[in-house]
Amino acid sequence: MKEVFIVATARTPIGSFNGALAGVPATQLGATVIKAALERAGIAATEVNEVYMGNVLSANLGQAPANQASLAAGVPNSVPCTTVNKVCASGMKAIMLGAQSIMLGDNDVVVAGGMENMSAAPYYLDKARTGYKLGHGNITDGIIRDGLWDPYKDYHMGNAAELCAAEYHITREDQDAYAIESYKRAAAAWEKGYFKEEVVPVQVPGKQMVTVAEDEDYKKVIFEKVPTLKPSFQKDGTITAANASNINDGAAAVVLVSGEKLKALGLKPLAKIISFADASQAPEWFTTTPVKAINNALTKAGMKISDMDYAEVNEAFSCVPIANAKDLGLPLDKVNVWGGAVAMGHPIGCSGARIVVTLNSILHQQNARYGVAGICNGGGGASAIIIEKV
């Protein structure tokens, strides 16, 4: 099979819920990173063979969101586009599908990533077509219904995360401490300019054009309040608004090329994709499925977890990286070293791609070689990918 290389990455800043990016459609956020990634790669849009973009909350976004983003980025309308919905793993699965298409010889240049504007997700009027007739009616929150709700147990993903915390004896104090460290790592990474090369500023139109160039959420934490917050999902729970990820807006993308195209165009690679894998188990245990996906990817690569210099394990909840690191035998000082979704935010269709983008940056700026990224998704699934800095 053909080798696959990452030749460029880009991500938007991550906007707060109803924050600076709330008025920018997910498709426009996607277009921003597609265009930026191609420009950074030095590849003409006419060279692109296919586009894959993850997106979860597609209601009211219009037909074929990936196609909208691709066309808005200047990619020709002759290029096929596919929107991927694997809940929180959508952006990573898009990269995996793009890589597979190159490995199999179907494509030579693919743009892949994810995009989400959770702030813009609509409410649903469930009985609007048939009529409410008489009496009170309900509206359904599209964010919760299609993004954050387990339809099997009929509860919030946070309730499932409480199972993980209990099973692994992860206390409220453990999770709060992890969350505070995530915020501190994100702040330090921004202060040191670590994200500068991956982030592309977003122009937000209005009475005056506003440029958004930095993640919003990590600056809003008040550390003294973290231990005082009430549990979010059950009265005796340990998960709070501070030690869980937030609701956010953002996009991320990578440009993938075959080894042959790399040479033909004289491109400089950033990383090589070594392997990738999915895994699944009972829906309520999605929190620990990254362990299985990462181990599957390691097995395919003929590698061990000790070969990984750094890891990105998406922080859907603080208990997720804590539990997964424990099962994998990963020291936490190798995991999410620039902070994670708890501090930076979790635009669900984007995050799988975002952690790949950040992992690549970490490998380059920390002079490391191998990294693995893993992300859980609703329904009991997870995806993982191993990359090597080139």
Please place each PLM-identified region on the residue numbering.
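Condensing-enzyme catalytic core mediating Claisen C-C bond formation in acyl metabolism
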Residues: M1-V24, I139, F223-T288, K292, ...
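Conserved catalytic cysteine-centered active-site region
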Residues: N55-V109, Y152-H156, F223-N246, D327-R354, ...
